Amino acid sequence: MDRDGILKQLGEQKCAIYCQYEEKAEEVTGEIRHCKKKGRWFVAAQLSTFLLAMISIAIYAMYYAEMIIIASGIFFVLAYIAARRLDDANSEKLERLRAVRAVYMNETAYLNGNLTAFRDGKKYVNPHHEFSFDMDVFGEQSLFQRINRTVTSGGSDLLAGQLCMTGTRTKLEIENQRDAVNELAIDESLRTSFMAVGQIGRAHV
């Protein structure tokens, strides 16, 4: 199905969110291209400064033991170190941007009915529980998979525990949880950054 067909099937609110995520993903893609371009320059700078430093050392050792040669060698070594650090920082930024883009792309896929990027919580299915086994609480296309945006095993366990809770809660507890959810709902940048950190963490496991 093409993009127009997808947007027609989505409600007004979903359509707005879908477009927002698409725009954000495109914006981040532009930043990624810029980082890649900078990365190529940093690699070239590292190679050139390293070679110039080696040449300076060779000239000093074999031909001229002059102060200017020593100074040139030190300068190129320092320039190499600076280029290396800038390249490392750029690589870290590139990794973060890729993770952020993955978050946006996962969300657009979710709005299109594709939930595969999110854990389905099958491991929490308990046939002895009052309702978690019979109802679509866990598993593919389940409630857990639809609302799961956790990035740690602890967070996933906590969410599963909330969904399986059978005891009663006080009005204050319910209101506090509702307020926390509403606060996170309006802070899109915080949510995205948090989930991006989780994407990076999973990639390094």
Positions of PLM-derived features:
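Switch/coupling subdomain of P-loop NTPase systems
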Residues: 1-43, 47, 53, 60-63, ...
